[in-house]
């Protein structure tokens, strides 16, 4: 479970750069959140959850960095199966579909004490398990294993679509595609995969609720339903445009303090930060996000094991897509899908899962010279 490295070696090889970038991004959220939720009745509760999730996330981050990441290949299948069970359970028994801010049965409530989103935890399990299978395929090609990987990769995506949660399913699909790319798929297989994906889009459309279809229509045509499905993005653009270079200042944003921005603590926190912290605040987020992903790519490229390359690349892809989608939907470059902004948005499960992935990536960085399996 623990690679035989000394405490001195651990601290010497610890990736302070990656952790520092993540903490800097988290700090922006900690600074902005009190202002963002100030006029919300649930504001105090959101802040408490945010602080608790960050603290727990940091503990998990440190814990996973201590554990030899290559050990996770043996437990990935266990966590993957548990994740599948939760994804199946949440479809009929979860909650959120009747909530206009959620729209899908994505959450499980535990005795009224706390709730969590299984798909967020599944992201970590997914990236523990699939890289181990790609590693085996890399070592010895097998049609049976290729089919097994295809089924294992697509099954969670299908279950999440049934909730229906288009945004999260897209995160999984993107990360799965990155794993295939890292593996080095032949072009003919890539063309076939793209063709199958394109052919499946009409079937995916059938599973979407009307409000999800309208969001896609608004993305294609911004003038479609500006007071309904297009309301969120229109308010987001207004907030960003009014922020200017330095912003209106914390607790001074008209849209943010007037509750003009829907889901401003999560999906549209980027626009709230843009209004109150301006172009400078938004630029800081984009730059830090870019540096985090670049650092992860560097770690993956330096790993001497296939598992290390796959697990870091896959987790980096998940985090990267969150950045791209969330910021993109805030500036009308992507359809609105309810994807949170990593390390900044309110949302305990996503925060905890994201920190856990960073911990695993740091573990891979510390042990990047490791080749043999434990």
List where the protein language model places each region.
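A juxtamembrane structural motif centered on a specific transmembrane helix
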Residues: 1-3, 33, 326-374
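Hydrophobic alpha-helical transmembrane segments of multi-pass inner membrane proteins, especially
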Residues: 19-27, 31-35, 39-232, 271-331, ...
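P-loop potassium selectivity filter motif centered on the GYG triad
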Residues: 241-249, 342, 350
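Short, Lys/Arg-rich, polar N-terminal cytosolic tail immediately upstream
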Residues: 1-11
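Long extracytoplasmic/lumenal interhelical loops at the membrane interface
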Residues: 244-280, 307
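Transmembrane helix boundary and interhelical junction motifs in multipass membrane proteins
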Residues: 165-170, 248-253, 264-266, 283, ...
